[in-house]
């Protein structure tokens, strides 16, 4: 779908402020000149007298006409400002006029204390804003691409304006793979050669049928759930597409080389304990154990597991009672963030601060790249972004999906404990619940059944349209 009404970054992922752009504020040339001078001086003063993270957005359409006088009069000041910002640890939010506050940031299970007072007294958070940006910019950023091979039998060689949900889901799954192979503390290195596992992960998300988790293969896997080139789908159908793709990919690899390309079990959580419509999704511990057993080819040992929990938390807008619960999921060490955004506009929400969601935006258009699995000298800059965008939590689409990664049995038990505590805080309206087992009548294991697919194999995905509104899905929460 169309992008959020934010101003974007360059396709090279560089910071627009470091490119000398300033915010437009008037249509007349005289007003532009005065405004430009005022902005330049004000920005300099902000850098000198304010905290390092009180830097306002400064971005301008490159096609705008510039006054000769303002160009010559403020260019030197702008160069000074650019040098100050680019050489230090300063950073800003882009997309709104809101500056970063000193409140704590929860980002994929990790807390960053940005208060200058707390930073000065706590050595672990001395450079909270800088360490957060390092973490943020190390996350895999997957965006619209153009110039790839046509998708299946279609003529689409780009996913611009319709592929944002696919790209958002790729980002979430990519983080799970990064956490699994490289750990939560991994940061993108500043020098080459890169870690082979890191390059291997990027290769899997390339834009061709040869790449395991490409947009081409996701659309093919999700065809029965309404995924098609040129069409937008909701998070529920997207989760089901991943379920199908992972299963198909696993079967193919077992036949060819006996290896697993997706190194964890996948559990799409939906339905309720009694199968009644309208109930909260239920994480069933026995089902998770069975999925891990199947992943390990019948062995009883626990395996890593990725949980995807699709939800609908309202009708036209999100029910406010769920917002505190959503925020708390980012405090879980197992957090992988949320597939969500404004209605019809998907983003990858990876953190929260106060009442704002912090996200990676897939709506930047970049050329398709081909990163070979063994090219440890590859240019990976188009897969990372240092621009943090924010969105009010009460504006996100009620149709979303939450992701969690549990490395082992202890990690899964910790997740269940935290989820149960969250249920206790929900006042009767939890995001999802946790139970030990399903009813005796449902004990016979069937992958489609335990993953929430109805007996006739049909799932109504037509209600998940571009407006973000939904119909009567069995997992809907009102």
Curated annotation (Swiss-Prot):
Function: Cysteine protease that plays a key role in autophagy by mediating both proteolytic activation and delipidation of ATG8 family proteins. The protease activity is required for proteolytic activation of ATG8 family proteins: cleaves the C-terminal amino acid of ATG8 proteins to reveal a C-terminal glycine. Exposure of the glycine at the C-terminus is essential for ATG8 proteins conjugation to phosphatidylethanolamine (PE) and insertion to membranes, which is necessary for autophagy. In addition to the protease activity, also mediates delipidation of PE-conjugated ATG8 proteins.
InterPro entries with a match to the protein in the record: Papain-like_cys_pep_sf, Peptidase_C54, Peptidase_C54_cat
Single biological process term from Gene Ontology: piecemeal microautophagy of the nucleus
Quaternary data: Interacts with ATG8.
Originating gene: ATG4B
Compositionally biased intervals (Polar residues): 1-15
Keywords recorded for this protein, A-Z: Autophagy, Cytoplasm, Hydrolase, Protease, Protein transport, Thiol protease, Transport, Ubl conjugation pathway
Secretion signal span: none
EC class name: hydrolase
Catalytic residues (UniProt): 164, 361, 363
A GO molecular-function annotation: protein-phosphatidylethanolamide deconjugating activity
One Pfam family linked to the record: Peptidase_C54
EC number(s) given by UniProt: 3.4.22.-
Name of this chain's protein: Cysteine protease ATG4B
Tissue expression summary: Constitutively expressed.
Family: Belongs to the peptidase C54 family.
Keyword Nucleotide-binding: no
Localization per Swiss-Prot or TrEMBL: Cytoplasm
């Amino acid at each position: 779908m169309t992008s959020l009404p934010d101003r974007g970054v360059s396709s090279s992922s560089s910071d627009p402020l470091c490119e000398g752009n300033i915010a437009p504020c008037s249509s007349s040339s005289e007003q532009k000149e005065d405004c430009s001078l005022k902005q330049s001086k004000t920005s300099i003063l902000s850098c000198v007298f304010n905290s390092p993270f009180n830097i306002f957005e400064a971005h301008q359409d490159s096609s705008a006409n510039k006054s000769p006088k303002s160009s010559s009069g403020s260019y030197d000041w702008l160069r000074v400002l650019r040098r100050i910002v680019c050489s230090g640890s300063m950073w800003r939010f882009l997309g709104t006029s809101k500056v970063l506050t000193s409140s704590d940031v929860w980002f994929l299970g990790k807390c960053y204390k940005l208060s200058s007072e707390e930073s000065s007294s706590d050595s672990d958070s001395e450079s909270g804003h800088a360490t957060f940006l390092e973490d943020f910019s190390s996350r895999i950023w997957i965006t619209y691409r153009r110039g790839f091979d046509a998708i299946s039998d279609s003529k689409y060689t780009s996913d611009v304006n319709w592929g944002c949900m696919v790209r958002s889901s790729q980002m979430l799954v990519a983080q799970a793979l990064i956490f699994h192979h490289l750990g939560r503390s991994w940061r993108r290195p500043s020098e080459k050669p890169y870690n082979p596992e890191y390059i291997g992960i990027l290769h899997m998300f390339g834009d061709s049928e040869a790449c395991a988790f490409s947009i081409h293969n996701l659309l093919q896997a999700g065809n029965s759930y309404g995924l098609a080139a040129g069409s937008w789908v909701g998070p529920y159908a997207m989760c089901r597409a991943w379920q199908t793709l992972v299963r198909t990919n696993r079967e193919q690899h077992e036949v060819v080389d006996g290896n697993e390309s997706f190194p964890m079990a996948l559990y799409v959580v939906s339905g309720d304990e009694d199968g009644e419509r309208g109930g909260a999704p239920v994480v069933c511990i026995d089902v998770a154990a069975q999925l891990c057993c199947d992943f390990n080819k019948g062995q009883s040992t626990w395996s890593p597991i990725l949980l995807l929990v699709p939800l609908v938390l309202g009708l036209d807008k999100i029910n406010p009672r769920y917002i505190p619960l959503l925020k708390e999921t980012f405090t879980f060490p197992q957090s992988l963030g949320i597939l969500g955004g404004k209605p019809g506009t998907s983003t990858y929400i990876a953190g929260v601060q106060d009442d704002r969601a912090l996200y990676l935006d897939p709506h930047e258009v970049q050329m398709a790249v081909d990163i070979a699995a063994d090219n440890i000298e590859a240019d990976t800059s188009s897969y990372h972004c240092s621009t943090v965008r924010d969105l009010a939590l009460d504006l996100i689409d009620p149709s979303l999906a939450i992701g969690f990664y549990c490395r082992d049995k202890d990690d899964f038990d910790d997740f269940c404990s935290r989820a149960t505590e969250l249920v206790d805080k929900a006042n009767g309206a939890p995001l999802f619940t946790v139970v030990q087992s399903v009813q005796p009548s449902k004990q016979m294991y069937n992958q489609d059944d335990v993953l929430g697919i109805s007996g006739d194999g049909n799932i109504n995905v037509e209600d998940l349209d571009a407006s973000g509104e939904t119909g009567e899905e069995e997992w809907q929460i009102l």
